Every structure is written in structure tokens, then in C-alpha cells.
């Protein structure tokens, strides 16, 4: 199998220079995996659409490029003596070479082919010597490494077969563990003994789940069993590393399947998920238990690239307080009074524990706390809510509300239409720049003072009264009208 996506990259010039110096050089790791996925998708598209005009998938751009070589770090430095070389991981055989775009031009490239906008920027490329890892004393890094001249020995130390593939500058693969076949079959499989791989670095447990979620893969049975056996290792992994993998996991296309199947594994780092599984809601409005309901909401919630993490987490956690607030009435119907506030508290505990950034934590908790907000097709009510929460938060709460209702399993089409119409109303308010906040008001504090109001708290009270009247459409948002109102009402 030949991978054109890599053989056409400018970084092949790095491999050429290593080869000219008498060394081997290969692309390795994620860039090879993504290039194979891209190549397979294009092949499938050509089969579906003769002439190769089908839509390209996957959409990911291959950016990070890692290179492995039999050259020792000092030899790599000598080969690239005319470049900037950083000792980014010299203990483990890694140096980073910084290239200018024009330095990656091959001899066959005309000078004008170089993108002039990129000539001032530097492209970092990690180059690592083939190695065999020693014992992992800290569950993250090998205590020692032994350099080797064998590419296969280097690939054997890697986590999963899909990441244990090398590609030369002509696009030809070296794939001793069947990684390309696993990519095609959508299987995540550990290289060698899965338990050993996970005990070397416990974060690989989260990485397995993340790759399966992102790539839409099943986890090979032996690897899957090892996940459960070794799950306790996650307790010793830093919160920041866990959180980074969790964010990638929940935004994956198969995140729901992974959360369902590996709740016990994720429960090591988020134990609050465990009571949700199998917790019957005993309510005719809900068809599923609490966890299944939340997972379904996570699967269907609409997101953007800039809010996907906290929206997916909000959907997954929005009812996490239900087990704690459950009660039954005299008819045996389940109720969860106050669960949004409890869910918000639990969310904050989780995000604090995972050392999440403040913006994500606060936005997530705000959405969860108010996910039961009542929405009506009332422009004035919507503007009041938009004033209180902000337009962006309101649109996100609406999306969570829509996903929440869909995930009951009993959502009627009329309710979906209602939510869509409410969204259109809010977007119209924004598009028409209708006034719903003090910053939109046609008058400000200086105008109120100019109208004769003494500086102080009364200025704020007047502005809030005017805003309320404008939102309720008792007054137009016109400066002359509002100034007259100040003069007559005060």
C-alpha cells in the first residue's frame, strides 16, 4: 500500500537528507495513521463515485509530523547543522528540528512554489532515534532507553498497532503488526501484551478509549479485557492528562458507544457516572435509565468546533444529580426535584478535580444548572433570558434542552419544531440587533445624568427600568423617546 498523502509532504525532504547522509528515516505515529485513513477513504470514494469525485473523508488535516531514524541524536544534529535543533527529549533520543518553509523545498521544486506567507514561520519536526524502552518505573516514562538500529524493534514499543506503522518518503509502509489492516477493520489493538502496554503508561487506557471514540473503532477483545483489569492505574495519572484525553473522547463520533461499554473504566476518574448506570427513572416521560438518557443526549446535541467539549460534557452530565435527588410519589412515579442544581454542583466538583480551565468549567456548570429552563415562543421572554444569561449561553441551553428532550425516547415532532422556531426567534433578535441588554440601549449613564438624574445608584435604576420597558416593547429603543421618558417619569 502506498500513501500519497505523506509522499507528497514537504517534510519528505527531511527523510531525503537523512538518507543522503547514510541513515534511515521514516514517518511514524499519528501522521501515518491519519494518512492511511485518508487514503482508504479516498479509495472508497472512488469505488462509490467513478473518477474519484466522491467527498473526501476523513476531514482531518495531517499536521504534526514525527520522524524516526537509526541516526543517534548527535548524528541528527550533524545532518541538520545548518538548522536550529532543540534538545526537546534528548534523554529518550528526541530532538526537534525547526525548518523554514523554503528550507523544505526539494531540488525539483521551483522557487515560486513556496508559499511566501509561510517563509517567516518555522515548522517543528520531531526526529527520534529508534529505541527499545526499559522499565517504566513511574507508569509514564521509561527509566532508561536503549538505542537500536532496528525499525521493527522501535515500532514494537508503541501503544497500538494503528500507531506502530512507518512510512518512507516514497509512501511505502513498514507494518509488522498489521496496523493498516486494523485501521481498515476499525480495530484498536495493543502492540504485544495489552496489560504490559497499559502498565507501562496508564494513560494508554484513556488513549485506547479516545482512539476508539474518535476513529469509530471497536477495541480488540484482549485489549478490551486488559482495560478493565488495569483500569485502577488511571487513579495515578495526573488530572491534566486525564482531562485532555476526556475532552478528545467525548467529541469523538463514537463517544456514546465508548461511554456505554466502558463506564466502569471511566468510573475510576469520574465515579459519579457509576450510579447513573442502570438507575431507572420510573417516569412515563423517560424510556431509558439515567446514564443511557445522558449518553443519547450527548450523541445528538448540536455543537460547533469552539464549544464541542463543554457542550458534549454538559449533555453527558446534565442529569448526573438525578440519583441523589430521586423520590417517588404515591403512585410510584419517579421525580428528581432540584436535580439541575445538584448536577451543577457535581459538575463543578468533577471539573475542579480534573483541573479544567475556568472558562470551560463555568460555562459547563451554567448550562447544566439551567438546562430545565422553560422556553416559550415569546420574543419578550426570550429577550429577558438573553439579557440575564447572554445570547450565546441561551442558544447553548436551548440546544441542550432539545437534546435532553430527544433523549427521553418520547419527544414529539411538534416539540422539535417548537425548539427550532425558538432558535430562529433568538437568531432574528440578534440579526436585527434588537435591544436586550444595557449595552444595546440607545442611552447610557451619561445621557441619564444629562437629563437631570444625580450621579449614583439612581442612574442604574433608571437604565434598568428603561431596558425593561424596551424589552417588553412598551418603549422603542430610540434615544429621543427614552430621554423624554426620563424627563417625564423622574
Map each language-model feature to its residues.
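Catalytic cores of the polymerase beta-like nucleotidyltransferase superfamily
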Residues: 1-490
Amino acid at each position: 500500500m502506498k500513501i500519497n498523502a505523506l509522499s507528497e509532504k514537504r517534510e519528505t525532504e527531511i527523510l531525503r537528507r537523512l538518507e543522503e547522509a547514510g541513515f534511515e528515516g521514516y514517518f511514524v505515529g499519528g501522521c501515518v495513521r491519519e494518512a492511511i485513513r485518508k487514503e482508504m477513504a479516498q479509495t472508497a470514494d472512488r469505488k462509490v463515485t467513478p473518477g474519484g469525485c466522491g467527498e473526501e473523508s476523513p476531514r482531518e488535516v495531517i499536521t504534526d509530523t514525527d520522524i524516526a531514524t537509526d541516526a543517534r541524536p548527535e548524528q541528527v544534529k550533524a545532518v541538520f547543522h545548518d538548522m536550529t535543533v532543540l534538545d526537546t527529549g534528548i534523554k529518550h533520543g528526541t530532538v526537534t528540528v525547526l525548518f523554514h518553509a523554503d528550507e523544505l523545498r526539494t531540488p525539483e521544486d521551483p522557487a515560486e512554489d513556496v508559499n511566501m506567507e509561510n517563509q517567516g514561520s518555522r515548522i517543528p519536526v520531531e526526529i527520534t532515534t529508534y529505541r527499545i524502552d526499559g522499565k517504566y518505573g513511574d507508569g509514564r516514562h521509561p527509566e532508561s532507553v536503549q538505542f537500536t538500529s532496528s525499525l521493527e524493534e522501535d515500532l514494537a514499543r508503541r501503544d497500538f498497532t494503528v500507531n506502530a506503522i512507518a512510512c518512507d518518503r516514497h509512501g511505502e509502509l513498514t507494518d509488522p503488526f498489521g496496523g493498516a489492516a486494523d485501521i481498515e477493520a476499525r480495530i484498536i489493538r495493543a502492540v504485544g501484551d495489552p496489560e504490559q502496554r497499559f502498565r507501562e503508561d496508564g494513560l494508554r487506557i484513556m488513549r485506547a478509549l479516545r482512539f476508539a471514540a474518535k476513529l469509530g473503532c471497536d477495541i480488540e477483545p484482549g485489549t478490551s479485557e486488559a482495560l478493565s483489569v488495569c483500569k485502577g492505574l488511571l487513579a495515578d495519572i495526573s488530572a491534566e492528562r486525564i482531562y485532555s484525553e476526556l475532552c478528545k473522547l467525548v467529541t469523538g463520533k463514537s463517544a456514546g458507544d465508548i461511554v456505554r461499554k466502558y463506564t466502569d473504566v471511566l468510573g475510576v476518574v469520574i465515579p459519579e457516572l457509576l450510579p447513573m448506570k442502570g438507575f431507572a427513572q420510573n417516569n412515563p416521560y423517560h424510556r431509558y435509565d439515567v446514564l443511557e438518557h445522558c449518553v443519547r443526549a450527548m450523541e445528538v446535541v448540536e455543537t460547533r468546533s469552539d464549544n464541542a467539549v463543554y457542550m458534549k460534557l454538559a449533555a453527558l452530565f446534565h442529569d448526573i444529580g438525578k440519583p441523589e435527588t430521586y423520590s417517588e410519589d404515591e403512585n410510584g412515579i419517579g421525580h428528581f426535584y432540584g436535580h439541575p442544581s445538584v448536577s451543577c454542583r457535581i459538575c463543578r466538583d468533577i471539573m475542579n478535580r480534573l483541573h479544567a480551565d475556568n472558562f470551560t468549567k463555568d460555562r459547563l456548570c451554567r448550562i447544566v444548572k439551567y438546562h430545565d429552563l422553560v422556553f416559550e415562543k415569546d420574543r419578550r421572554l426570550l429577550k429577558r433570558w438573553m439579557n440575564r444569561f447572554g445570547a450565546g449561553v441561551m442558544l447553548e441551553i436551548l440546544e441542550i434542552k432539545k437534546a435532553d428532550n430527544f433523549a427521553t425516547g418520547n419527544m414529539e415532532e411538534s416539540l422539535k419544531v417548537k425548539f427550532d422556531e425558538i432558535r430562529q426567534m433568538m437568531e432574528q433578535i440578534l440579526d436585527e440587533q434588537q435591544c436586550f441588554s444595557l449595552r444595546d440601549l440607545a442611552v447610557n449613564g451619561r445621557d441619564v445624568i444629562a437629563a437631570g438624574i444625580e450621579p449614583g445608584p439612581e442612574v442604574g435604576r433608571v437604565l434598568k427600568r428603561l431596558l425593561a420597558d424596551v424589552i417588553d416593547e412598551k418603549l422603542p429603543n430610540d434615544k429621543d423617546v427614552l430621554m423624554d421618558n426620563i424627563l417625564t417619569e423622574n
